[in-house]
Amino acid sequence: MARKYFGTDGIRGLVGEGVITPQFFLQLGWAVGKVLAQQNGDKSGGLVLIGKDTRISGYMFESALEAGLISAGVDVGLLGPMPTPAIAYLTRTFQASAGIVISASHNPYTDNGIKLFNTDGTKLPDDVELAIEDQLDRAMTTASKLGKARRIADAEGRYIEFCKGSLPWGFNLRGLNIVVDCANGATYEVAPKVFGELGANVIPIANKPDGLNINLDCGSTKLNQLQKHVLETGADMGIAFDGDGDRVMFVDEKGEVLDGDQLLFIIASHKHKNGGCSGVVGTLMSNFGFELGLKNQGIPFERAKVGDRYVIEAMKNNGWQVGGESSGHIVCSDVTTTGDGIIAALQVLLALKAEKQSLHQLKLRMQKMPQVMINVRVTNKVDLDSHEQVQAAIASAEKRLDGKGRVLLRASGTEPVIRVMVEGQEHQLVASLAQELADIVGEAVA
């Protein structure tokens, strides 16, 4: 059954348009509450935690969700601004019926959306999302017994202790100078405290959210300021999160970027060396050099569809504990249930301290293959699989790569774009082929 509202990572869009309205969030809160009550045998929907990032519209949507849930007889715990993975963790440890995150991740403040977690801190299964969608199309009715709402005062401290507790006893970051870019988002309080309490000298940037500056020229998708600060301060590294804290990117002491593939490689290699990595899940977008680097160590590798829910599903199916995406979504399931930027960063730092090498030296252990990705904005939906001109262009590009690269066209699950990716041994050829393909795709969807 096709979904009407939920995408690959919840619901997301421009505030005030489509379903990103207070009216819809009120109805959504009620629908979630009704489904939870049904799961509990038509008893109370239990407790639902609500957290958010720092965008200004979060307060409006928090109130709407709260009202909808309470009207369905559900108790609500309000967490305030917290990273998405923190909300997953707290949902699990509070034994809540569900957790809701109000966020649009790495998007600008003009967007917002929601993600939902199950009672065990994992993304909601498809059948539950479909049940919620079914309720959304029904008229709201107030429960005979209303729920109550309360603020969770110690949420931040609980999550900080969880992050520190994920490391071996006695581990510290003393002697490291780290620039931390909080994207003016949900990690602005938590991230500097975690690294600082572990002994690092922390230089925080983009840590003054005003509701409008989340992800604005900062964070994991805009690394220029982080690179500049690392070089100017002579720091050992920089760490950047996205607006809701489930993605992470690093910058080494030379100002060079380490993406999700390179960070996963460092984590997996260290775990493998210590007998704790039976395999790694990447995605269709993972760099081929990453795959080769793992195979050279005898580490099995599998590609899943793009989206952390598919990565986690493949990890479970294989019984593996490490997986993630080039974008910086990294899952270490021996520690947490979902992508967690801070936990992933700590795993990289654990490897760095154990290897007694600089981040740049660790970066050089994996040779990335040149990869170019171009986003083509979509105005009309077109079946590219049956589009003769597009398919002919793909075949031509693959022939020119001569079996030493990859071509991938993929519709984004969160934006109205087609991602055109070409990978190969020679950057000039890769860039040329990617642009040629993007131009042809652009004509097809115009």
Swiss-Prot record:
Enzyme Commission numbers on file: 5.4.2.10
Catalysed reaction equations from the record: alpha-D-glucosamine 1-phosphate = D-glucosamine 6-phosphate
Gene3D superfamilies per record: Alpha-D-Glucose-1,6-Bisphosphate, subunit A, domain 3, Alpha-D-phosphohexomutase, C-terminal domain
Chain sites annotated for binding Mg(2+): 105, 242, 244, 246
Primary enzyme class: isomerase
Keywords (A to Z) from UniProt: Isomerase, Magnesium, Metal-binding, Phosphoprotein
Keyword Transcription: no
Posttranslational mods: Activated by phosphorylation.
Gene Ontology annotations for the cellular component aspect, listed alphabetically: cytosol
GO molecular function: magnesium ion binding; phosphoglucosamine mutase activity; phosphomannomutase activity
Pfam families tied to this protein: PGM_PMM_I, PGM_PMM_II, PGM_PMM_III, PGM_PMM_IV
Positions annotated as active site in the UniProt record: 105
Binding note for cofactor: Binds 1 Mg(2+) ion per subunit.
GO biological process: carbohydrate metabolic process; peptidoglycan biosynthetic process; UDP-N-acetylglucosamine biosynthetic process
PANTHER family in alphabetical order: PHOSPHOGLUCOMUTASE (ALPHA-D-GLUCOSE-1,6-BISPHOSPHATE-DEPENDENT), PHOSPHOHEXOSE MUTASE
NCBIfam families, sorted: glmM, PRK10887.1
Similarity comment: family membership: Belongs to the phosphohexose mutase family.
Protein name stated in the entry: Phosphoglucosamine mutase
